[in-house]
Amino acid sequence: SIAFSRAVFSEFLATLLFVFFGLGSALNWPSTVPIPTVLQISMAFGLAIGTLVQTLGHISGAHINPAVTVACLVGCHVSFLRATFYVAAQLLGAVAGAALLHKLTPEDIRG
């Protein structure tokens, strides 16, 4: 159905954005004199997850993590089919987010 497809795409997009912004916050850009601290990086991850849950949570539940999806499957909160598609979308979203960050980041910044 359309709602199921939207939910799967929502998981893909949320995971892509979470990985992109989270990992992007840990890069050492030349304009930042000191390297990002653990607190700054964790704040970026926290703000990213909070924002994504608020914006996409009503569509799919915003699991954004295969471990959360598997836990929901074990707890009988989602069907096996939904969990399978969610995990696949999350894995693809994570790879796509990292690949996008890799392509958009200058080579000397990547480390």
Curated annotation (Swiss-Prot):
Residue numbers covered by motif NPA 1: 65-67
Topological domain spans for side Cytoplasmic: 1-6, 57-61, 72-82
Localization terms from the record: Apical cell membrane; Basolateral cell membrane; Cell membrane; Cytoplasmic vesicle membrane
Post-translational modification: Serine phosphorylation is necessary and sufficient for expression at the apical membrane. Endocytosis is not phosphorylation-dependent.
A single GO BP: water transport
Intramembrane segments per UniProt: 62-71
InterPro entries: Aquaporin-like, Aquaporin_transptr, MIP, MIP_CS
Domain notes: Aquaporins contain two tandem repeats each containing three membrane-spanning domains and a pore-forming loop with the signature motif Asn-Pro-Ala (NPA).
Name of the protein in its database record: Aquaporin-2
Gene assigned in the entry: AQP2
